[in-house]
């Protein structure tokens, strides 16, 4: 397993590489109690400041990184969904059952989608980063204003985010299970 300082450098480099490839704000979040904590943030070109900011705790049910963590961390997901879920915009999904259905679609797709649910003018996509134990330990995300991250580009951008997250997972010691 890489040392903690080496892991931090590896994560920072991976987020920067994704930002350079996409030209949009990218970040990496980890679970922190019932929230997602932004550990790495790299601002995109001409995007303006997009949340989450470095060291900011954000809700999981309405952010791309938070949804990716919820989708792949079942026990933690249930702890989060048992709590009251705040509404931040008219698009925020606060229903635990509808969120469970959305998270099942997230797992099937391979990345989460946040469409103006936390801030009314941004969208985000995120994919899980797995550790050597196979648990989703973080989520790598891209967030941008709606005019920069258009819904018809989700598939292409989502694939790029998933590839970056898979590469980071491998660097952190994750070996995907091989189907028999």
Regions picked out by a protein language model, each given a short descriptive name:
Residues 1-9, 159, 166-174:
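N-terminal helix-turn-helix
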Residues 23, 74, 85, 108-112, ...:
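Generic structural signal for secondary-structure transition and capping sites
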Residues 17, 21, 101-105, 167, ...:
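Solvent-exposed, charged/polar functional surfaces in cytosolic regulatory/catalytic domains
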Residues 2, 89-91:
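Flexible, glycine/proline-enriched loop segments at strand-loop-helix junctions
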Residues 79-87, 162-180:
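Cysteine/selenocysteine-centered motifs that mediate thiol-based redox chemistry or coordinate metal-sulfur cofactors
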Residues 1-83:
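Amphipathic alpha-helical effector-binding/dimerization core
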Residues 92-165:
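Extended hydrophobic
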